[in-house]
Amino acid sequence: MANERTEPLQLNLGSLRSAMSLTLHTHHASRIWHGRAPTEGRPGIIGLNGFIGAMNKMKRGAEQDDPYSDWWMLRIEDKLADTKTRLQTLREQVDQALADVPAALSLGENMNVQPVKLPLFVNAQLGFMAVYLLADYDDLARKLILAHHTALIDRSTLERWLNDGAHALRSLFSLAQQYRYSGTTRDDFAAKNAAARAALEKFGELPQDVLEGTRRSRFAPPIARRTTKPGTPPAAPAIEPDAPAHTD
């Protein structure tokens, strides 16, 4: 018995999953979640669902060694930081307004008695960063509404600050809406083949350090060995802008 060989124990572990949801209290944040439908003379803008879908596809593109996906991740990361700064500036302004409340008066937080709870299916860190920004905007909107209700700011200030915050988020989502997977790899550019030439003509030149892979987003995924033919997008379901954002 002591000489019998034992087979190693096989552990077939699946992927880790966590149930997540986002609770929104204001119609202003809810509209950002859903996006803006196209109208005559004004293009539509994806909502948070569409942004998450774009980030998931962008991450998969970067995994496939698409240098354009890496470049887009860097651009979105910079835009996320800019959006966060803009919302923080608005928060400081409304906090200053609320600071004028007399010490004898106590103001509680204004919470919606029927908030909307939205499920989240996010597979990219840049997607999570946008979720945090929308949650910040929802909290900011609640404080602005409270400040107006208690005569600390007038209606024009309320509307201007709400619009400034919404514009910052929609500008972020509008940028992400332009992303397209190029179907090329860095090997294509090293070989200077037809796929690389077509991508250059369609998407333009890339910064050299991005093309070489020496500069990537801090949330860029490891590059996987390519198993699909050039020009074939990463195998994953597309996500419609206003459909629930599911991921693999």
Task: State what each model feature region is.
Residues 1-133, 139, 146, 166-248:
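Polar/charged low-complexity regulatory segments
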